[in-house]
Design a protein with these regions (language model features):
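FIC/Doc superfamily catalytic core
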Residues: 1-241, 245-309
């Protein structure tokens, strides 16, 4: 990894802004900004400081050549540190609420929801209503909360990821919103804003049966497996609505089953997320999506380890 990538990974892990990192390194904001924008190269003394901070933050004893390899190794170390991520979340009400809030707010906002994070919190945890917001948006928040609660309990029993679970999650998410909640679509759909062909509705049950079998196959590279499954699910687009939300819940089910923190895909990363997904679906290149998921899981670990950004 070059020094720019080391700094970027330090930022991602710690949540520190550029001012704070500059202070830690003993340089000006302007100097750090020049390094990050490839307009200058750190002097040898600062290269040593960057590497020292990188090793301190990551807990590694070396700097990896490849950024994605460094992130993957960091994830493995965090898995070893957190012996049971799911139980850790469930046994800590504040942490659990933060995951439910972050996952619900971001997932709904990615799909066009207009509730703020504070409004989402008030609806979910205090049963507040906002006259300026639609009843559907209120239901989307409460339903996503219910889906996560159901999912956490389901995973505690070490139950398999199967079609029954996928249909149940859709039923919960679309309860009171769509009449086809809990059923595969029986009509054609297209992915808005993407030139990606979706499956013929007649083939959906067969494709989902195959997908459910593949979800539970063991893989040496968990993140690669998750990226492939997520890409396939979203291209099948098995439901009339709610595919993105269900897909991200399945992604986090797979991650939690392998003792990873949930992937928190932030609304501000929406375009990058869609771009990575598009490359996986049209070019069969899952590497960008894998890297994106790695970053999103690291966001989840910030909640798990109480690092705020």
């Amino acid at each position: 990894m070059n020094y720019k990538e080391q700094i970027q990974l330090i930022q991602k892990i710690t949540g520190l802004n550029q001012d704070e990192i500059a202070n830690r390194l003993g340089v000006t904001f302007a100097a750090l900004n020049r390094w990050l924008n490839d307009k200058a190269v750190p002097r040898e003394s600062f290269k040593k400081k960057i590497t020292k901070l990188y090793i301190e933050v990551t807990g590694e004893d070396k700097v990896f050549e490849n950024l994605q390899e460094a992130k993957s190794n960091l994830l493995e170390n965090k898995k070893k540190k957190h012996k049971n991520v799911l139980k850790e979340i469930i046994s800590n009400p504040d942490m659990k609420d933060q995951f439910v809030l972050s996952l619900t707010y971001n997932s709904n906002t990615i799909e066009g929801g207009t509730l703020s994070e504070n409004e989402t919190r008030a609806i979910m945890f205090h049963n507040k209503t906002f006259p300026s917001k639609s009843m559907i948006e209120h239901l989307e928040a409460k339903n996503h909360q219910t889906a996560l609660e159901y999912l956490f309990s389901y995973l505690l029993d070490e139950s398999p990821i199967n079609e029954k679970l996928i249909l149940k999650l859709h039923e919960i998410l679309m309860n009171g919103i769509h009449s086809d909640a809990g059923f595969y679509r029986r009509h054609a759909v297209r992915i808005v804003g993407a030139n990606v062909p979706t499956a013929n509705h007649v083939k959906v049950p067969y494709l989902m049966e195959e997908l459910a079998e593949d979800i539970n196959k063991k893989s040496k590279d968990v993140v690669e497996h998750v990226a492939i499954i997520h890409s396939r699910f979203e291209q099948i687009h098995p439901f009339g609505d709610g595919n993105g939300r269900v897909g991200r819940l399945i992604m986090n089910t797979m991650l939690l089953k392998q003792n990873n923190a949930p992937a928190v895909i932030k609304q501000k990363e929406k375009q990058k997320y869609y771009s990575c997904l598009n490359k996986a679906q049209l070019r069969e290149d899952t590497v960008p999506l894998e890297d994106f998921i790695l970053d999103s899981v690291l966001e989840g670990y910030k909640i798990l380890e109480r690092v705020t950004s």
